[in-house]
């Protein structure tokens, strides 16, 4: 997979800019991404230590919305299976996510 060009990175950052201007907007963006993930894969909720015992109906994900990319106790297959959900959510960021997920998956358990 070819890395993103500087122009593509600049374009993505410009597009995301209005959605990440404040901590509140960053959290809202992250919460939306996690709602998409947990809606499609509710079994993933319990892979997050602070969400043990919760369901899609009562999960509180604001904390995770603000920390979208951190180390998680999941294996490589579990991590990589979330890729299509995030790609769907971030349709305009598809090329970036296809580039990042395999690299990040190397660091998964």
Swiss-Prot record:
One of the record's GO molecular function terms: oxygen carrier activity
Domain of life of the native organism: Eukaryota
Residue intervals of the Globin domain: 3-109
Keywords: Heme, Iron, Metal-binding, Oxygen transport, Transport
InterPro entries linked: Globin, Globin-like_sf, Globin/Proto
Miscellaneous section: This globin lacks one of the heme-binding histidine residues found in most other globins (replaced by a tyrosine) but has a high oxygen affinity despite this change.
Family note: Belongs to the globin family.
Function as written in the Swiss-Prot or TrEMBL entry: Oxygen binding protein.
Subunit details: Monomer.
Protein name: Globin
Species of the source: Dicrocoelium dendriticum
């Amino acid at each position: 997979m070819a890395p993103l060009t500087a122009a593509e990175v600049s374009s993505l950052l410009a597009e995301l800019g209005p959605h990440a201007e404040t901590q509140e907007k960053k959290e809202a963006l992250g919460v939306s991404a996690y709602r998409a993930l947990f809606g499609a894969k509710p079994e993933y909720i319990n892979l997050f230590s602070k969400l043990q015992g919760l369901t899609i109906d009562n999960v509180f994900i604001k904390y995770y919305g603000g920390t979208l990319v951190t180390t998680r106790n999941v294996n490589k297959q579990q991590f990589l299976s979330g890729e299509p959900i995030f790609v769907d959510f971030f349709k305009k960021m598809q090329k970036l996510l296809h580039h990042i997920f395999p690299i990040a998956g190397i660091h998964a358990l």
